[in-house]
A protein has these predicted regions:
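Membrane-anchoring hydrophobic helices of lipid-metabolizing enzymes
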Residues: 217-242
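Generic alpha-helical structural element
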Residues: 77, 104, 123-124, 128-132, ...
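Solvent-exposed soluble domains appended to multi-pass membrane proteins
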Residues: 238-634
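A diffuse structural propensity rather than consistent per-protein peaks
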Residues: 95-108, 127-133, 230-233, 311, ...
Length: 634
C-alpha cells in the first residue's frame, strides 16, 4: 500500500501523467487503422491513391481531438460511442463492398426496408475476423479502468489554455489537409462530390472518412431543403398527370404488334448519330449497324436528354421515362423510390426481366436502382468471366458473346436491358485501337480518330451479337431496340470534328444539332414502323413506345410514344427544348432553327415554354416525394 502511495506521489511530483494522451492517441491510431484496411478492401475494386490515407488520418485525428475537449466526465462514454459508431460504419461499408461492390450512402437509408430480403446473403459475407475491428473498444475501456488509479490526478484532465491552443492548432492543420485535398480533387473532377457517380472511386481519391463527410453533407442538405408537399400541390400534380395520360392513345395497327416477343434493349456507350452511314477513307464506320437499320426503323431526330448522370440518366429515361434529377443523380438519390417503370410493367405481364452490364454493380448505384425499376436480376461484372478487359471493364466482344449464351438459357418472354462499355471516353485504350483495325487517316491520334476506331470496334462486335442471336433462335422472336446514351466528342475537340463532317461548330445551333443519338427499333415481320421520321424525339419516348408494341399498358413516366402525331417538345434538364427543328432556350429567351440557325420569334413559344417548365417541375416532385404510388392509386 505504501509502495502504491509512493508511486502515486512520484507520478504527481514528476508531472508525467500521459494516461489521457496515450488513451486518445491509441484511439486515433485504431480508427486510422480501421479505415486504412477498409480502403485496402476497396482497392480491390478501384485504384488506390496514397493521399486518401493522409485524409483519413487527418479526420481521425480531428475527431479524437474534438472528443478530448469535451467535459471531463463525458469524455469516456463519448469516446467509446464515437469509436463504436465509426466502427459500425466501417463494417457497413465492408459488407456493402462485398455484396454490392459499392459503399454505403446515407441517401439509401430509405432502402432499409429491403435489408430483410437480402439479410442472409449479407450476413454470409460477414467474417468472424471482422470482429477484430471492435477490439480496440474493450481495450480502451480496460486501459481506463486499470490506469485511472495509478495517480492522484483524475484520468481525464481539465482543459488548460495551452492544451486548448495546441488542440485547436492540430485540428486546424488536419482540417486544412482535408480541405486542400478536397479542393484539388473537385477541381480535377468538377461536381463529383455532389453527383457521387462512383463512390469507391471517390473514396479512393479522398479517403473513406472524407467520402462519408461529403455524403452526409449531400444527404443533409437534400433533407433540409425539402419542404413538405401540400395537399393542393399533390392534387395539382395528380390532375396534371391525369391530363397527360388522357392524351395517350393506342395507335391503330401498333398496339400488340409484337405481343409475346422478347425485348432486347441495347444502350451503346457514346454512340452519336453522325457516325451512322459515315465513311472514312472509303470505309464505313458502322457497316453492321447500317445493315441493321435497313431492316429496322431509325429515328434520325432523337436527342440526348441526359444530365449530370450521363449513362445512368439515359438508363433512367429509357426505362422509367422521367427526367434527370434537378441536382445530383437520380440513380444515386432516388434508388429508394417505388417506380412503375417498364421492367416492372413487363414483369407483371409474365416477362423475365434482366439488366446486363460488364461493369461493377456499384457503379452509378445500379445494384440498387435496377431492382427498384423492376429488374429481377442484374448480371454485372462479377457474373461474367472477365476473360478480356478493355478500358473500364469487360470488352464488348466478351460481353456480347457471354450475354447471348446467357439469354439462350433464359425462359421466354424476357426483357434484357444491355449496356455496352468499350466505346467509353477517352476511347484511346491501346488494346481497343489495336483490335479495331480501322485506319482513321489524318485523324489518327486525335480524340475524334480514337472515337471512330472505338465505334468501329463496337460495330463489329454488334454484328457478331446479331449473328449470335440468330444462331440461338432469338432474333426472330425478339424486338430489338438500340440507342446511344449521350454525346461523345467534347466541345474543345470540335475543330477536328468540324473538319471531318464539314460543319462549322463555332455556331451553337450546329453543335446542338450534332448532339443527336441514333434510336433504332426492329420488330420481327415489320419492315418499317409508321412514325414521323422528321419529328424530334428523346429517350423519354422509348418506354411507352416499346410497351405499345408488346401490347402492354404503361401508365408511368412523362414521355409520350413516337407514334403520337402531336409535335411534343424534347425536354432537356436545363429547361431548354427542341420542338420540330426549333431549339428554344428560355434562359437566353431565344429560338433558332437547329439546321439553318435562323432566329424565330421567342414569344411564339411562351405557352410551350411554360408547359416544359411544368413538366420538369412535376418530374422533380414525383422523384423528390416518391409520388408514383399515390398518383397511380385508383
Amino acid at each position: 500500500m505504501n509502495h502504491l502511495l509512493e508511486s502515486r506521489v512520484v507520478y504527481r511530483v514528476a508531472g508525467r501523467d500521459y494516461r489521457e494522451l496515450i488513451f486518445f492517441s491509441f484511439m486515433a491510431a485504431a480508427l486510422f487503422i480501421k479505415f486504412y484496411f477498409l480502403e485496402y478492401e476497396i482497392s480491390r475494386f478501384v485504384v488506390r491513391f496514397p493521399l486518401s490515407v493522409a485524409a483519413s488520418a487527418a479526420i481521425s485525428a480531428a475527431a479524437v481531438i474534438s472528443v478530448s475537449l469535451f467535459w471531463r466526465r463525458g469524455r469516456l462514454p463519448l469516446a467509446l460511442l464515437l469509436d463504436f459508431l465509426l466502427t459500425g460504419l466501417v463494417i457497413t461499408d465492408l459488407l456493402h463492398m462485398r455484396y454490392y461492390s459499392d459503399l454505403f450512402t446515407f441517401h439509401n437509408l430509405g432502402l432499409s426496408a429491403q435489408v430483410g430480403e437480402v439479410s442472409e446473403s449479407v450476413f454470409a459475407l460477414f467474417s468472424p475476423r471482422d470482429l477484430l475491428y471492435f477490439i480496440d473498444i474493450p481495450l480502451l475501456y480496460g486501459y481506463y479502468r486499470i490506469f485511472r488509479r495509478i495517480s492522484v490526478h483524475p484520468f481525464f484532465r481539465r482543459i488548460t489554455s495551452r492544451r486548448a491552443a495546441w488542440s485547436l492548432l492540430l485540428f486546424a492543420a488536419a482540417a486544412g489537409v482535408v480541405a486542400f485535398h478536397i479542393a484539388g480533387y473537385s477541381k480535377k473532377v468538377p461536381g463529383v462530390l455532389r453527383s457521387m457517380w462512383d463512390r469507391p472511386a471517390v473514396c479512393s481519391n479522398v479517403g473513406a472518412l472524407t467520402y462519408h463527410l461529403a455524403d452526409s453533407w449531400n444527404t443533409l442538405t437534400d433533407w433540409i431543403c425539402r419542404r413538405p408537399l401540400s395537399e393542393a400541390e399533390m392534387e395539382d400534380i395528380r390532375e396534371w398527370y391525369e391530363e397527360h395520360l388522357s392524351k395517350q392513345r393506342r395507335p391503330q395497327g401498333i398496339f400488340g404488334v409484337a405481343e409475346g416477343r422478347n425485348l432486347i434493349v441495347l444502350q451503346v456507350e457514346s454512340l452519336q448519330s453522325f457516325v451512322v452511314g459515315l465513311k472514312v477513307g472509303g470505309r464505313e464506320v458502322t457497316p453492321n449497324l447500317n445493315a441493321f437499320i435497313k431492316e429496322a426503323s431509325l429515328a434520325s431526330e432523337a436527342y440526348n436528354q441526359t444530365g449530370a448522370g450521363n449513362s445512368s440518366d439515359a438508363e433512367f429515361l429509357a426505362n422509367a421515362s422521367f427526367y434527370p434529377a434537378a441536382s445530383g443523380v437520380a440513380f444515386t438519390r432516388f434508388a429508394g423510390n417505388r417506380y412503375a417503370a417498364l421492367p416492372k410493367a413487363l414483369l407483371d405481364c409474365g416477362y423475365r426481366t434482366l439488366a446486363m452490364h460488364g461493369d461493377r454493380a456499384g457503379f452509378w448505384n445500379r445494384g440498387r436502382m435496377y431492382p427498384a425499376l423492376g429488374f429481377e436480376r442484374f448480371i454485372s461484372k462479377k457474373d461474367y468471366v472477365n476473360d478480356e478487359a478493355i478500358g473500364m471493364g469487360l470488352s464488348d466482344k466478351s460481353f456480347f458473346r457471354q450475354s447471348v449464351e446467357m439469354l439462350s438459357k433464359e425462359p421466354q418472354p424476357f426483357y434484357s436491358f444491355m449496356v455496352t462499355l468499350t466505346s467509353h471516353y477517352p476511347f484511346s485504350f491501346p488494346k481497343l485501337l489495336a483490335q479495331a483495325g480501322f485506319d482513321t487517316g489524318e485523324y489518327s491520334g486525335t480524340v475524334v480518330g480514337s472515337y471512330l476506331s472505338a465505334i468501329h470496334y463496337f460495330d463489329r462486335e454488334f454484328g457478331a451479337f446479331i449473328k449470335g442471336l440468330k444462331k440461338a433462335g432469338l432474333y426472330d422472336k425478339s424486338v430489338i431496340a438500340l440507342y446511344g446514351d449521350h454525346n461523345a466528342i467534347p466541345r474543345w475537340d470540335s475543330p477536328t470534328l468540324s473538319r471531318l463532317l464539314g460543319i462549322d461548330f463555332t455556331k451553337d445551333h450546329h453543335w446542338r444539332y450534332v448532339q443527336r443519338v441514333p434510336l433504332v427499333i426492329n420488330v420481327p415481320g415489320v419492315k418499317k414502323l409508321a412514325w414521323n421520321q422528321k419529328m424530334a424525339l428523346g429517350l423519354a419516348n422509348l418506354p411507352r413506345t416499346l410497351a405499345l408494341l408488346l401490347g402492354v399498358d404503361f401508365e408511368s413516366g412523362l414521355g409520350s410514344d413516337i407514334f403520337d402525331a402531336a409535335e411534343a417538345p424534347v425536354i432537356f434538364r436545363n429547361g431548354s427544348y427542341v420542338v420540330g427543328k426549333i431549339f428554344v432556350e428560355p434562359a437566353k429567351k431565344s429560338a433558332v432553327h437547329v439546321e439553318s440557325g435562323e432566329a424565330r420569334d421567342y414569344a411564339a413559344y411562351a405557352e410551350m415554354t411554360e408547359r416544359v417548365r411544368k413538366t420538369l417541375d412535376v418530374s422533380d416532385k414525383i422523384l423528390e416525394y416518391d409520388l408514383m404510388p399515390k398518383i397511380l392509386r385508383k
